[in-house]
Amino acid sequence: MPKTQSAAGYKAGVKDYKLTYYTPDYTPKDTDLLAAFRFSPQPGVPADEAGAAIAAESSTGTWTTVWTDLLTDMDRYKGKCYHIEPVQGEENSYFAFIAYPLDLFEEGSVTNILTSIVGNVFGFKAIRSLRLEDIRFPVALVKTFQGPPHGIQVERDLLNKYGRPMLGCTIKPKLGLSAKNYGRAVYECLRGGLDFTKDDENINSQPFQRWRDRFLFVADAIHKSQAETGEIKGHYLNVTAPTCEEMMKRAEFAKELGMPIIMHDFLTAGFTANTTLAKWCRDNGVLLHIHRAMHAVIDRQRNHGIHFRVLAKCLRLSGGDHLHSGTVVGKLEGDKASTLGFVDLMREDHIEADRSRGVFFTQDWASMPGVLPVASGGIHVWHMPALVEIFGDDSVLQFGGGTLGHPWGNAPGATANRVALEACVQARNEGRDLYREGGDILREAGKWSPELAAALDLWKEIKFEFETMDKL
């Protein structure tokens, strides 16, 4: 048997973390939760000591030896820093790979996992900067979670929509409309050809538009547009609320109105609330759209925080059928390789490690349903060929200003997007190259769609060309 700390005896005092938590000879187990951290130690702190400190402070350690260590098997429960490597091209920057025993975590609780791994260690003085780049959830832990309420295939079956990405639109202005005018905007977009419309992240229940009024007028818009088009329509009714009890009351009312999908701001509301809502959605046959409001506060800086791929994986465990993922081509931050890496982590069942896409660990989801990525933020019809090529069919392409900003109004804006999408999907299915021929494909479609022609003319010069801050 390996010699444990208990067998070695107790000696009071402070000792280097690496004596206990740096274990370069350790081989991770299939049941271990693995984490990859990017870190920069303070001057004078060796990389192995800093890596060990991260393992200690995110698992069983504290700053001094304590006699109660003798009451348990520390070697069994401690986090183990099993590998450290320098970050290529960066001075005093390293990756630390840490293995955590499965027993450290409560089953089915993203809240507990994050509280353990990132809850305290990010304020540790010995570390100048720290970022959680990736997590490998072991299958044994994955199986304790419900995950998405329904998943991609069930959603397509419920909505009877196949063979193409789905189209959405965020209603603008995001704040200030009365409930009736809001419902009117929803109706115009849906009758024009969109599959979904959406509450913005900060629409909850404000004085100018109380939630119950909004739900009622939106329900009228959905039922009317469905009757006119013969297609199933949806609107992401934001049920995010000050309390979980109020959140569930709003969700129940949406269900009573026959709404197929609701929405939640999972970061600002918290993982406990989100998991509660996801389980309710599974039990009640309601789809769940997830907005990532506040994510850039956590994930945008490349040297400190949590990468969005970790947040996306945590959301898949907690539960959501849609998740905003960036666009690559729009107004919001998003490197292409990295974005496609975490999009696969959202949708696929098994993803191999691929550092070129930021995927540090092979992840097996054990048949857990996938999450539809939602491309949203500064996109318009000229982006359609690239979006179809990048995201494929299993996605939601969401045009807010790119629908409502059409010179002829909401319904023509929706029609322009639908025509552009159908043209790109047909061209792709015929074997045409969307990257090389995308402009020609759109112009050809615009010849028989005046709505698309007007949109192409309006936004032909609009681009968002800024350097991505978070590069691999």
Curated annotation (Swiss-Prot):
List where in the cell it is found: Carboxysome
Active site per the UniProt annotation:
172, 291
Asked whether the UniProt record includes Metal-binding among its keywords, one would answer: yes
Q: Which organism is it from?
A: Synechococcus sp. (strain ATCC 27144 / PCC 6301 / SAUG 1402/1)
The record's annotation in SUPFAM superfamilies points to: RuBisCo, C-terminal domain, RuBisCO, large subunit, small (N-terminal) domain
The Enzyme Commission number assigned here is 4.1.1.39
Post-translational modifications reported in the UniProt record: The disulfide bond which can form in the large chain dimeric partners within the hexadecamer appears to be associated with oxidative stress and protein turnover.
- Keywords, alphabetical: Bacterial microcompartment, Calvin cycle, Carbon dioxide fixation, Carboxysome, Disulfide bond, Lyase, Magnesium, Metal-binding, Monooxygenase, Oxidoreductase, Photorespiration, Photosynthesis
Entry protein name? Ribulose bisphosphate carboxylase large chain
Q: What else is known?
A: RuBisCO folding and assembly commences when the nascent large subunit folds with the help of the chaperonin GroEL-GroES. Monomers require chaperone RbcX2 to assemble into RbcL8 octamers yielding RbcL8-(RbcX2)8. RbcX2 is displaced by RbcS; as RbcX2 is removed RbcS mediates the ordering of an internal RbcL loop (Thr-64-Leu-70) in a catalytically active conformation. The basic functional RuBisCO is composed of a large chain homodimer in a 'head-to-tail' conformation. In form I RuBisCO this homodimer is arranged in a barrel-like tetramer with the small subunits forming a tetrameric 'cap' on each end of the 'barrel'.
- One Gene Ontology molecular-function label: ribulose-bisphosphate carboxylase activity
Say which family it is in: Belongs to the RuBisCO large chain family. Type I subfamily.
Location of motif Interacts with RbcX2 in this chain is: 461-467
Q: What is the effect of changing residue 466 to A?
A: Remains bound to GroEL
Q: Which residues bind Mg(2+)?
A: 198, 200-201
Per UniProt, what is the name of the gene that codes for the protein in this document?
Answer: cbbL
Q: What is the effect of changing residue 106 to Q?
A: Protein aggregates, forms RbcL2-RbcX(2)2 homodimer intermediate poorly
- Reading the lineage from the top rank, the first entry is Bacteria
Enumerate the Gene Ontology biological process terms: photorespiration; reductive pentose-phosphate cycle
